[in-house]
């Protein structure tokens, strides 16, 4: 059985499919009511599943007529998506951000489940046992070296 976050994520992805557009606009209160959950649950899903690393941009307007606009960053090919990821990595990256990137690569069919798991082990904090700053820098360097290879094959 899926948890509420998975259900909300699938619903939003279905909205993209049905609209055939790269932009979906939702209202926090309506979604919360539809799924009988608190608005913070929706915020969690947006913050963790529709990130820049996953290939989305978020615009949010709070208040009475507030909305959340989710825009797919459209990269028609693998090269465009990988170049986008290389731009957002920066000099360092957290483990969670790295996992988001791997999720995005997996969603787009650029890596297999097995490859994603192997890369997760490589960039995991248990593998990179050192101070946080150095670990995040090394993790970024690993991903910057891997991404062009993923694009090549």
Swiss-Prot record:
Any Pfam family: CtsR_C
InterPro entries, per the entry: CtsR, CtsR_C, CtsR_C_sf, CtsR_N, CtsR_N_sf
| Keyword Transcription regulation recorded | yes
GO MF, one term, reads: DNA binding
One GO BP on record is:
regulation of DNA-templated transcription
Name the gene that codes for it.
Answer: ctsR
Q: Which Gene3D superfamilies match?
A: Transcriptional regulator CtsR, C-terminal domain, Transcriptional regulator CtsR, winged HTH domain
Q: What domain of life does the native source organism fall in?
A: Bacteria
Organism name: Staphylococcus haemolyticus (strain JCSC1435)
Q: Does the keyword Protein biosynthesis apply?
A: no
Which UniProt keywords are given for this protein, alphabetically ordered? DNA-binding, Repressor, Stress response, Transcription, Transcription regulation
Recorded protein name is Transcriptional regulator CtsR
Q: Which family does it belong to?
A: Belongs to the CtsR family.
Q: What is the role of this chain?
A: Negative regulator of clpC, clpB and clpP transcription by binding directly and specifically to their promoter region.
